[in-house]
Each structure stands twice: as structure tokens, then as C-alpha cells.
Amino acid sequence: FKGVYTVKEVAAAGAYTIHDTMAVLTDANGAEVKVTMIQRWPVKKAITCYREKPRPFKLLETGVRTIDTVNPIVEGGTGFIPGPFGTGKTVLQHAISKQAEADIVIIAACGERANEVVEVFTEFPELIDPHTGRKLMERTIIIANTSNMPVAAREASVYTAMTIAEYYRGMGLKVLLMADSTSRWAQ
């Protein structure tokens, strides 16, 4: 929605389908808008629902002291981990996933080797979230497309991850989105 709306009515507590009207809003011109539980999130279209994008100012605590000190990342900002094969980029990604101050962690494994994707799926369910003491997978979403999958699937994996991240960000949650490996995705 764009603009200012007033809530006219809200459905009573109960069981509803996604097509039932949950609320009725009125805009500044008096036009009514019915709100259902259906949501549409375009994958390749820019989000334009905010009037002005706020500038990032708060540091993201990754939990990895060297990154927080030498190469700090702001919440809402972008960071990258360059390096050749076998230098520990994925290990660092796992450490950041585990330690970062985020409500939701989204990992897009795009174009990764199959053994690396299998490693993620076997290790992540065993990791414990140090902030809650529960399984890390309870707040993690993994989208995996290996290097032997079609190029279109690799491309879609990052866009899908971004769309999911925007959904949770729109709910007011802190989202950590990581794509591994963007060089293979760019190919």
C-alpha cells in the first residue's frame, strides 16, 4: 500500500481462508480496500512501498571479531568475502550465520558444488543458536541450487532469496541474506 489508510473494520477472531476479507481500509479519498491473507511478492521487481529508503547507520554485529573490526558492515548494508577455492569462505559464512544479530538467516547456495551444499544441509541442523540455545535451523532458510543444475535455476535462487528477505524485512525482522557463490551466479 502507498499512502495513508484508516482501518474501517477488522474481522473477528476465528478460522478463515486466505480469500476471506480480514480488514477493510479506507484511503484519503474514501475508497475502500479489502485486505485478505493473500500476498504477492514479485521476484524481479523493485520494492517501492517506502517513500524514502533510510540510510544505514547501525553496525551489524556479525559475531566474527575480525570482520566487525577490520571490515564492519552496517545493518542494511552489503559485505563480501573474496577469495580463491578452499580458503574458508563457506566456513566464515557458517560462523556469521551462527553468531550474527539477526532474526532470520537466508542462505542462497547458488552454483555451489554438490558436496558443499550437502555439507550445509548436514551441518546446519546440528548447529545451536548461541542467542536462543535452540537449533539454528529454526531461523534459517536455505535455497540450494548446485553447479550442475540449469543456469536459470541458479539465477532464480538469488532472486528468490532476496524476495524472501524482503518479505521478512517488511515484517520488521532483522534479516541476514547471504549468497554463496555470487561469482558462479554471475556466470
Question: Whereabouts are the PLM-identified features?
Answer:
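A structural micro-motif recognizing beta-strand termini
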Residues: 7-13
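P-loop NTPase nucleotide-binding/switch module
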Residues: 1-7, 18-83, 90-95, 130-149, ...
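Switch/coupling sub-region of P-loop NTPases
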Residues: 70-84, 91, 95-187
